[in-house]
């Protein structure tokens, strides 16, 4: 789909909650799901993903894909959804934007390799709109069972590349956000080595992790869109080489 960013705010109505930009975001996460699943199935070499389409009664649906009992992955789940409907009453004052309807699409994944030398990972990337207001969220983190510093450096370098291309402020802020988001207060420790995390990222405002704030200066909607796409595409580069390196480590 060709995107006309000058008309990005079209839609967002009860008749068309997604608009062209929402449909483009959905197409983007579907393509990303294909890319990630193809890469993981190639690395595994034995098992394949089983697809389970589903529908949401209130509007929308998705497709879940699961690979089980593979040669490399014990289980890998990669799911995409696109849902819409009325903004719940409890969210009307807490959710950005205005208007009675919302649209949300995204991809979410959790991967568990068999070999403890290969790390578990989690990632998600999402686009949400309410009326004319649209924002992005997402992130990826890595949980090694056996820590290899070179793997940690590779993972962070791959995730930092799209951040640095968009703004020098992004990576340090999103890395710190991830560290705080996945901090286990009860155990007084972080979950794995972190990664990046961001939410409610929109042009002309600020983002906050509840502790610190960052102004989103000089970046219009198109720039943030390109960052979001690049951040999602960076996941395969960040994770797959690590699994290829560690899947046969004894």
Outline where the language-model segments fall.
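Solvent-exposed, non-transmembrane amphipathic alpha-helical segments
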Residues: 49, 56, 100, 127-131, ...
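Flexible, active-site-adjacent loop/turn segments at secondary-structure boundaries
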Residues: 47, 52, 65, 101, ...
């Amino acid at each position: 789909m060709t995107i006309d960013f000058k008309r990005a705010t079209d839609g967002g109505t009860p008749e068309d909650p997604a608009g062209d930009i929402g449909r483009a975001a959905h197409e983007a996460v579907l393509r990303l799901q294909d890319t990630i699943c193809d890469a993981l199935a190639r690395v595994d070499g034995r098992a394949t993903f089983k697809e389970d389409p589903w529908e949401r009664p209130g509007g929308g649906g998705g497709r879940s894909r699961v690979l089980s009992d593979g040669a490399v992955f014990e289980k890998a789940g990669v799911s995409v959804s696109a849902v819409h409907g009325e903004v719940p009453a409890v969210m009307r004052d807490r959710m950005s934007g205005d208007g009675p309807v919302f649209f949300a699409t995204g991809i979410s994944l959790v991967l568990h390799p068999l070999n403890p030398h290969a790390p578990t990972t989690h990632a998600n990337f999402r686009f949400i709109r309410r009326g004319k207001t649209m924002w992005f969220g997402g992130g990826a983190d890595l949980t090694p069972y056996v820590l290899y510093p070179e793997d940690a450096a590779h993972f962070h370098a791959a995730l930092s590349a799209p951040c640095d291309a968009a703004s020098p402020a992004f990576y340090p802020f999103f890395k710190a956000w991830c560290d705080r988001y996945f901090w286990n207060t009860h155990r007084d420790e972080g979950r794995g080595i972190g990664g990046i995390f961001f939410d409610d990222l929109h042009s002309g405002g600020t983002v906050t992790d509840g502790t610190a704030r960052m102004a989103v200066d000089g970046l219009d909607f198109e720039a943030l869109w390109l960052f979001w796409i690049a951040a999602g595409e960076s996941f395969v580069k960040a994770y797959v080489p690590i699994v290829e390196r560690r899947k046969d480590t004894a």
